């Protein structure tokens, strides 16, 4: 029942009504738009479920922690470079906004 609703909704969404501007009768033409089907083949058969690769909490930790460490290392090296070449030297007097 749900599948028939999906197929009907997909069929309706691919039809485009266009009116002919030159004709006074206002005839409508149905133009079928190309459709990229997500769930079904052209024959109507359902596509198989995609393979899901579970990463979980370990995958998140394995990507976030190295990213933070690499970013911190790069920023530390850039701050040292700027200070060594006297391009930016922080002073203690700038901290007071009185």
Swiss-Prot record:
It comes from the Eukaryota. Pfam families: DDDD. One of its GO terms (cellular component) is uniplex complex. It is found in: Mitochondrion inner membrane. One of its GO terms (biological process) is mitochondrial calcium ion homeostasis. It is a single-pass membrane protein. The keyword Metal-binding does not apply. The keyword rRNA-binding does not apply. The chain crosses the membrane at residues 52-72. Keywords: Calcium, Calcium transport, Ion transport, Membrane, Mitochondrion, Mitochondrion inner membrane, Transit peptide, Transmembrane, Transmembrane helix, Transport. Essential regulatory subunit of the mitochondrial calcium uniporter (mcu) channel, a protein that mediates calcium uptake into mitochondria. Belongs to the SMDT1/EMRE family. This is Essential MCU regulator, mitochondrial.
